[in-house]
């Protein structure tokens, strides 16, 4: 029951809240990737090397994660101790951000992430393991204590077809294995299926 100024403005039956939506039964499939693609030819001259370098630096596995990271509130109400972005223009991403949830206290909270879209496209399990390993490395790089880590997953799986659900299952397996290997719990997450 939600009340405002002594008046009931919302009343949601708990049975409906917890059991009102029928559960869907979805089935996923997964098959191992056919393996690595062919290696590219060695660039024949300086111009071809420059082009290859430009393409590598633009690749999502290498390029700046700034467009992704700018989408969430990394400053958290002005309690930032170590900003996620640095450099003269404030656009160079760092390994992680550190916030002080209680001003004046000698401790903080580290916020880090990891991502490898190419590896995840071959196998969501190893993409998930890589993402967790990168996030953990980024956390430690700014002084985070690996024994005090709480993990958070964010899954966005917009197409609930069998192949996508199989990949989702592999990603969840990776989360479970990372949790078991590190001894660190998943404390929260957001999972979106269409």
Residue spans for each PLM region:
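Glycine/proline-enriched, intrinsically flexible loops and inter-domain linkers
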Residues: 1-194
């Amino acid at each position: 029951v939600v009340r405002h100024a002594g008046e009931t403005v919302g009343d949601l039956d708990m049975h409906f809240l917890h059991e009102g939506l029928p559960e869907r039964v979805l089935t996923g499939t997964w098959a191992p990737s056919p393996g690595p693609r062919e290696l590219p030819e060695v660039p024949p001259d300086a111009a071809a090397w420059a082009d290859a370098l430009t393409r590598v630096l633009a690749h999502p596995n290498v390029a700046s994660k700034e467009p992704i990271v700018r989408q969430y509130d990394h400053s958290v109400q002005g309690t930032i101790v170590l900003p996620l972005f640095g450099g003269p223009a404030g656009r160079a991403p760092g390994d992680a951000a550190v916030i002080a949830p209680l001003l004046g206290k000698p401790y903080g909270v580290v916020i880090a992430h990891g991502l490898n879209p190419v590896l995840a496209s071959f196998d969501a399990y190893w993409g998930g393991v890589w993402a967790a390993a990168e996030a953990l490395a980024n956390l430690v790089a700014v002084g985070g204590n690996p024994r005090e880590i709480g993990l958070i997953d964010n899954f966005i799986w917009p197409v609930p077809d069998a192949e996508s659900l199989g990949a989702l299952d592999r990603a969840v397996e990776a989360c479970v294995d990372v949790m078991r290997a590190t001894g660190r719990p998943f404390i929260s997450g957001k999972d979106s299926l269409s």
